[in-house]
Amino acid sequence: MYAPYATMPDRSRGRAVPEEESSFRSPFQRDRDRIIHASAFRRLKHKTQVFVEHEGDNYRTRLTHSIEVGQVARTIAGALGLNQELTEAVALAHDLGHTPFGHTGEDALHEMMAPYGGFDHNAQAIRIVTALERHYAEFDGLNLTWETLEAIAKHNGPVVGELPWALAACNRGIDLELHTHASAEAQVAALADDIAYNHHDLHDGLRAGLFTDDDVCSLSIIAPAYAEVDEIYPGLDHNRRRHEALRRFFGVMVSDVIETSRRKIAASGAQSVEEIRALDHAVVTFSDEIWTQLRELRAFMFTRMYRAPSVMVVRERVAVVVKALFAYYLENTMAMPERWHGDIRKAETETDRARIVSDYIAGMTDRFALQLYDRLALGA
């Protein structure tokens, strides 16, 4: 049973290319399934967030992260009476536009693309699902519903100011009403992303030895979880103690979003998805108390993990890889795989060519980018 403010599948604004409706899947189920079967989604298996792929099999990748975000998003959406299929579709698609090597790769590609409009991973996700996936006979992209496109574009809130070129190109053909908030389903996907990375980055950092359990017990949002585990399970072995504490931390975040969002939605008086979009604030959020504690956690993680010396050494190296690949292919565009040659022949300006090169590099996995860099002897 949907809440009145949920996105109703039978009221979808449809797809850019009209299609016959399925007799057994909702429009948003079809969107989710198309995302799962997209080649860009499969490539997330070999794209990392903090640790480069070869550093260990137990660290999260973009794919495992996206699956975790989807699970959290469905849970929260169900508790709030929202459309779980739409929420999950957005959650699974939110990282499609990421480059190899996480935000380091994105920063390097954005630097190289600065003369040509820059690079933005959220806009690239839209570009992938509207243009770059080329498997269907009747359209490029995945031909997703308006609601799913809107949610991918605006899951972090209204898009104001100058638009990234890839998003502007899409919006010229499909007005996504970028100045408004997105549906509550999109807002849930954004918070689920926060919850998932807060949890798994902490776990991965502990596993990597960048900090200890005692270190994280200094954090106000983590300490109660360890204290509760120690009280209930005295003498528990190290790994089980950590797992039990982190799952409690995870549960605190999920419960807080559900309880806080219920109150905010009720206070807003919204009775439709249109009224959710028309509000001047998001309705799916953490409480002020948890936000404060999470800011403390993020400051800790920034210092101890994201800017740890061992991580920074690798980041500097992979940034060189991305920049070298971009420079090489901008000078040698026809050296790109044959599937790109049609686009290259249509390119009229250097900006057009640079954006094609950007598409190619952004789609690479960590492993492929490193192997290609070595094969081309770009570090010689």
Swiss-Prot record:
Belongs to the dGTPase family. Type 2 subfamily. PROSITE patterns: HD. NCBIfam families: dGTP_triPase, PRK01286.1-1, PRK01286.1-3. Residues 62-198 form the HD domain. InterPro entries: dGTPase, Diverse_Catalytic_Enzymes, dNTPase_2, HD/PDEase_dom, HD_domain, PHydrolase_assoc_dom. This is Deoxyguanosinetriphosphate triphosphohydrolase-like protein. Residues 1-28 are annotated as: Disordered. The keyword Hydrolase applies. PANTHER family: BIS(5'-NUCLEOSYL)-TETRAPHOSPHATASE, SYMMETRICAL, SLR1885 PROTEIN. Keywords: Hydrolase. GO terms for molecular function: triphosphoric monoester hydrolase activity.
